[in-house]
From Swiss-Prot:
Residue positions of motif MBD-associated domain (MAD): 31-69
UniProt-annotated stretches for the region Disordered: 154-186
Extent of Low complexity compositional bias: 166-178
Tissue expression notes: Expressed in rosette leaves, buds, flowers, stems, mature seeds and roots.
GO molecular function terms listed in the Swiss-Prot or TrEMBL record: methyl-CpG binding; zinc ion binding
InterPro entries: DNA-bd_dom_sf, Methyl_CpG_DNA-bd, Znf_CW
Free-text note on domains in this protein's UniProt record: The methyl-CpG-binding domain (MBD) functions both in binding to methylated DNA and in protein interactions.
Keyword set includes Cell inner membrane: no
Disulphide connectivity of cysteines: none
Localization per record: Nucleus
Protein name, per record: Methyl-CpG-binding domain-containing protein 4
Gene it is expressed from: MBD4
Domain of life: Eukaryota
Organism: Arabidopsis thaliana (Mouse-ear cress)
Gene3D superfamilies (UniProt xref): 3.30.40.100, Methyl-cpg-binding Protein 2, Chain A
Amino acid sequence: MKEEEEIGKPAKPKAKKDVAPGRLIDTYAAQCDNCHKWRVIDSQEEYEDIRSKMLEDPFNCQKKQGMSCEEPADIDYDSSRTWVIDKPGLPKTPKGFKRSLVLRKDYSKMDTYYFTPTGKKLRSRNEIAAFVEANPEFRNAPLGDFNFTVPKVMEDTVPPDPKLGSPFPSTTTTTSEKSSVKQSHN
């Protein structure tokens, strides 16, 4: 906690234009390696921690306090929301930065952005390298931890006519042993 205070407050994105509801991830989930039930993950940070270790330490229900495989699933994979699958093993976002994923209006894919502790939006590896070079206090942030790999949009959960926009106001991100999954729209 002290380290976070020294670096600065977590990034709060400064949006020039609002993103329509349902195009940002609002729920994170991980699939149990044993029972295959989906468990809602409380925060993006916790989700990224699970995803970064998924290959060597698969998620299971017992990793959530008070949870077991005997409990019903927290959330079901269905078309009531748009789901996106994340790749397991992606690194955690460096401290002080915020990774943002935005679903395109046509539901074809997601775009990845990073917000700096000052709120500046970075769209590419070159922009990140330039920011780190210009701000020596962030030189310890490993450039390899800024990953622009985007989750796969699960076509069977996309609304029938994406041009009309989603009838669902949210998105969920999830992770399983073979892949991490994120959901986008409720």
